[in-house]
Amino acid sequence: EDLTRLLAVNFNALLEAQPDAAAQGWGPIVGVTGDDGLFTEIYGQPTAASVIEFLLWNPLNPNAVISCVTRARENARSVREQISSEMWERINRLYFRVKDADRAAVMRNPHEFSLLVRDGSQGFQGVTLTTLSHGEGYEFIRLGHHLERADKTTRILAAKYAYISRLPATSSETSLQLIALLRS
C-alpha cells in the first residue's frame, strides 16, 4: 500500500518537474526499498518505466508489489484454518487484481493502481479487525503492520532528504519534492 502511494504521488510530482529533475527523481524512489543495487544490476539508470516495472511487477524484486501480495497470499493459505474466510477472500481477491492488472494502463496512470492496492490492503485490515479474535494472532498482525509502517516512513524520509538536500533551497523542484514527501 505504502509503495504504490509513493509511486503515484511521485509520478504526479515528477510530471510537473523539469525534464532533467524528473530523470533524477526516480532513483530515490527505488532507494526507499533499499533495492537500489538490484535495480541498477537489472536496469541501469532509473526511468519512470523501469522504476514502476521494478517496484510493481519484477519477480526478481522481493519488495515488488506482486512479490509481496504473492507472499501474503501464500502465508494466508498456510494459516487458513486460523484466519477468517473473509480475510482469505480479501487477500485472494487482491492477489488476482494485482496479477491481472492492465500493466500498460498502470504505466500511464499509477494512481488508479495505487487505489486498487490501497483498497485491497485496507479492506483486509478492516475484515481482520472485525472478524479475527483479538488474541495473539491479531496482535502479531498489528505488530507487523506498525513495524512495516515505521520502516517505510524512515526509508522515505531518508531517501527524500538525500535528494532534496542537493537541490537549491529556492527552486520550484524543491517545493514539488517537499509536497511529494508530505503526500507520500
Where are these predicted regions, by residue range?
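Alpha-helical transmembrane segments and their helix-helix packing motifs
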Residues: 2-184
